[in-house]
Every structure is written in C-alpha cells, then in structure tokens.
C-alpha cells in the first residue's frame, strides 16, 4: 500500500467503522489510511484554544502548536472524521485542520431500526467513510472522479439520496 495518504478519525463505537473503512480502502482501492482514535473532540478544541490564547498573550515568544496539529505533523492527505454525534463536533477542529477535514455525523433525525441502518442513513458507516475519503482525494486532484463514481456504486452509496439532515 505504501505510505498512508488518508487520515481517518473515529470516536467511540464509530472507531470500528473507521477501522473497517481502512480495510476496505486497502483491499478494494489500494489506498492506505491511518486510523486515529479520538477520545474527545471537545478536549482537542479546548487545548487548541488554550494554545491560541497563549500565543495571543505572548507575541514575543515562539508560537506554540496545538496538540492536534503536532500529532498530525508528517501525516498528509485528507482527514475524514466520523462520529455518532453531530458533524459540528469534529468540525470544531477545522480552524486548525483547514480544508483537509471532512466531517461525518448524525445531523437530523433517524428513522432506523438498528445501529447499522442508522449509520448508513446518516452516512457515517464504513462505506460512507470510504466514499468521503475517495471523494476528497478526487476533489484535491489525487484521484480520477470516474474511479470515485465507480467506487460509490461498488459501495452501494445512493448518490441521489436525500440529505439526512433534511430528511
């Protein structure tokens, strides 16, 4: 597979979906991914805000770097963050992760009878994580859009499904 070109964040029970997505990416699409277990997006944000405050109050000192930025140093490529909370939870890291972040979460109201259907409905199951990663690679110019379209079909992604946040 070579060096990982994707970073996958998973939290709580969704970590298993990220691990499965890593396996699918490697086996079906020959794309390596690192999986990161995020125990608290809120704590990562608090720490980053604390660093930001310190930097603001100490302009003559060398800038400090938030932990989330330090941890990702040397790990390139898009970052797909999946959670069983709303997308805004991982989105709160976007000031430090920039445009490489794609957040997946449970925005809206589910009409699912089990967890597997719920995760598929909200597009944060392993197949949706793979689809988001491939789409971001394509948008960044690193993967042919035709390959992504074929992968969406292979993964059973309904590209015309109603947005779960508005369903």
Segments and roles (model prediction):
Residues 1-167:
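Thiamine diphosphate
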